[in-house]
């Protein structure tokens, strides 16, 4: 699931995904965070 959080590295997405979806599985794709459940 892509969330509206800008990123340059996956590490930036981990807290965002944890907050948004309760998952720490995150990637940075095309400058946006992507969370995996």
From Swiss-Prot:
- Which cysteine pairs make disulfide bonds? 7-28, 13-33, 17-35
Gene Ontology CC annotations of this record? extracellular region
Q: List residue numbers at the site (Basic residue of the functional dyad).
A: 27
State which tissues express it. Answer: Expressed by the venom gland.
What the entry lists under Pfam families is as follows: Toxin_2 (PF00451)
Keywords attached to this Swiss-Prot or TrEMBL record, sorted alphabetically, are: Disulfide bond, Ion channel impairing toxin, Neurotoxin, Potassium channel impairing toxin, Secreted, Toxin, Voltage-gated potassium channel impairing toxin
Where is this protein chiefly located? Answer: secreted
Indicate yes or no for the key word Secreted.
yes
Record flagged with keyword Disulfide bond: yes
Q: Give GO terms: molecular function aspect only.
A: ion channel inhibitor activity; potassium channel regulator activity; toxin activity
Q: Read off the InterPro entries from this record.
A: Scorpion_toxin-like_sf, Scorpion_toxinS_K_inh
**Annotated site (Aromatic residue of the functional dyad):** 36
Give the similarity note. Answer: Belongs to the short scorpion toxin superfamily. Potassium channel inhibitor family. Alpha-KTx 02 subfamily.
Q: Its biological function?
A: Inhibitor of voltage-gated potassium channels.
**What is the designated name of this protein?**
Potassium channel toxin alpha-KTx 2.19
UniProt organism field: Rhopalurus junceus (Caribbean blue scorpion)
